[in-house]
Regions:
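NTP-binding/hydrolysis catalytic cores, primarily Walker-type P-loop NTPases
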Residues: 293-324
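ATP-hydrolysis module of ASCE/P-loop NTPase motor domains
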Residues: 83, 89-126
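The Walker A (P-loop) glycine that initiates the GxxxxGKT/S ATP-binding motif of P-loop NTPases
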Residues: 14
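Conserved catalytic-core segment of NTP-binding enzymes
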Residues: 2, 18, 22-26, 33-34, ...
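Short, solvent-exposed amphipathic alpha-helical segments in soluble enzyme
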Residues: 27-29, 57, 89, 206-211, ...
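N-terminal phosphate/diphosphate-binding loop that engages ATP/GTP or pyrophosphate donors
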Residues: 29-99
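Phosphate-binding P-loop
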Residues: 1-7
Length: 324
């Protein structure tokens, strides 16, 4: 993890619903605990991190302090565009240009324009010299990127616009962003998955897409919510014997209610235990698929509880500190 945290930008992405925000938050906690001024960036109108830390969201475009050395930001493409234009041409002309029908049409209609603007803002956050002199830079920026397909589109937007514009400020800015994304010393990529066939397949496709578009690959794959393998072979055999030895359930008679309840409990418990074992074995088989493809894999234990709260994310951060 030390080498990862030495980069300026870490991109966290993967299949939808696998826990990308959870993992990005956990890495943010870990980096902050190590004294790095850290920012976790959300996109696509997401602003969930303040709530995790018991705070009210400040709205898109506001860098919010979550705790010592840790901030969050939900990128607002319109605000980012205004900041960029003001940096290029001054406050007044920037506002005029941003409000012009030409630029509004460009950002609304040009495919990938909002993605490019978001990536430009993320690039700016990694710089020691920010667009506004009073803004302070960060040691590490964590991008909680969209799911795989949208993330790849977002990451390739600088190259697309550089090819379209060729010269001028858009081409120059796109080149700077692309250089960051392709620099292994400054930028790293983490895939997040779960132990399912679809998530593993999408992780493989993500790695291939990064290599194709950016000549980069995944530094590691973090497999979230992995169930423990609790039972030995002998214990599984004993569970099978217990399940097979319980007679078929019938309606209890007045004199057999206690035995009926005991048999019912035994059957339910053994079936549940065997189902959990089968699920865990399936997950570990999927993790083995990733390892056979030479990915560095880190498994995150399933967090049991009514909800995934800050203590659970802290436990994940502690686990990552030991494994990466």
């Amino acid at each position: 993890m030390t080498s990862l945290l030495e980069r300026k930008l870490l991109v966290v992405t993967g299949k939808g619903g696998v826990g990308r925000t959870t993992i990005a938050s956990a890495i943010g906690l870990l980096a902050a605990d190590r004294g790095l001024r850290t920012l976790v960036v959300e996109v696509s109108n997401q602003d969930r991190l303040p709530e995790l830390f018991g705070l009210s969201a400040q709205g898109p475009g506001v860098e919010t302090e979550l705790r010592e050395s840790l901030w969050s930001l939900s990128v607002d493409p319109d605000r980012a565009l205004l900041e960029w234009l003001q940096m290029l041409g001054g406050r007044v002309s920037g506002r005029l240009l941003a409000s012009s029908s030409t630029f509004q049409y460009f950002t609304a209609a040009a495919p990938g324009a909002k993605e490019l603007i978001s990536m430009v803002k993320i690039w700016e956050l990694t710089q020691s010299k920010r667009w506004h002199g009073r803004a302070v830079g960060y040691d590490l920026v964590l991008l909680d990127a969209p799911a795989t397909g949208h993330a790849l589109g977002m990451l390739q937007s600088p190259r697309t616009f550089r090819a379209i514009a060729r010269v001028g400020p858009i081409a120059a800015q796109a080149q700077q962003v692309q250089a960051l994304l392709q620099d292994p010393r400054r930028c790293g990529y983490l895939g997040v998955a779960q132990g399912t066939e679809m998530a593993v397949r999408e992780t493989v496709e993500l790695d291939a897409g990064l290599r194709r578009e950016l000549d980069r690959g995944l530094h590691a794959v973090i497999v979230n919510a992995v169930l423990p393998q609790r039972f030995t072979g002998a214990e599984l055999a004993r569970l099978a014997q217990l399940s097979d030895g319980v007679p078929a359930q019938r309606a209890p008679t007045p004199g057999s209610r206690r035995q009926w309840a005991s048999d019912s409990l035994t059957r339910s418990a053994t079936l549940a235990a065997r189902a959990v074992h089968q699920r865990a074995r399936y997950q570990h088989n999927q993790i083995a698929r990733l390892r056979r493809r030479r990915f560095q894999v880190v498994s995150i234990p399933f967090q049991f509880g009514a909800e995934l709260d800050l203590p659970a994310v802290t436990r994940i951060a502690e686990h990552l500190a030991r494994k990466l």
